[in-house]
Every structure is written in structure tokens, then in C-alpha cells.
Amino acid sequence: MIPSIKRNKYGNTKVIIEGVKFDSKLEAFLYKILKDNGMDFDFQVNIELVPKFRFQYENIRALNMRVDFLLRYNGREIYIDTKGFATSESKIKYKLLKNKFKAEPQVNIIWLKTQKEVNAYIGRLKEEKEEWKLL
């Protein structure tokens, strides 16, 4: 059972599993699946989307995005974000993230919105792994 801590304005319930704090039940669900399947991943990865710059006399801060998971799998980097509700800010950052990695075919960017999508995606990865073993 996942203990709840506090609900935020989007209805997410923050949870703690194994001493790790998650912003939502969906994020915690994916963490548990990745860990149970022994997958190599990093959690809460910060990515610079737009570097800091100077405009006239003003210093403009860098624009960053925190992606929930960076999964290293079959020679690829898979950035996974769990978000049940898409805000206008998250949509823009998602597009900037895709733009940042557009020339890197070994990079995948995935946005999972439900536990059903999480199960389906991890299932596809496991099937792909089995196919590679047969080759």
C-alpha cells in the first residue's frame, strides 16, 4: 500500500516508498516497476533546455526541466516523464526537450499518463529484450 502525504493543486498525492519521495502515485508506480525489473535508471534528472544568456543589460536564467526517469536500455537513453495532467508549461518544455534531442536517434522521450500506459510500455520493452536474446 502506498501511504499518502499531501495532495497538490492537480490532485496528485505525494508518496514515499523506500525513503524516496514521489510527486505522484503514478511516478511511484513506475519507480517500483523499473526497480522490480532490475532496469538501469536515474531518478529526477535535470536537463537544461535553454542555456543562460545575456539580453541587453539583463542576465536571463537557464530554462531547465526535471524528467522523472532516465532509463538506459539496449544502448538507448529513454527519458520518461509521468504526468496525468498536461499544463501549458509542461507541453512547451516537452517540445523543447524533443528539440534538444532531435538529432540523437538513440534517445527516446516518453510521456506516460496512466498506470495502464506504464504497464503497456514496460511490457513492450520486455518483449523487445526477449527478441534481442533470440538474435
Stretch-by-stretch model annotation:
Residues 1-135:
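Electrostatic, structured charged patches in enzyme active sites and in nucleic-acid/phosphate-binding
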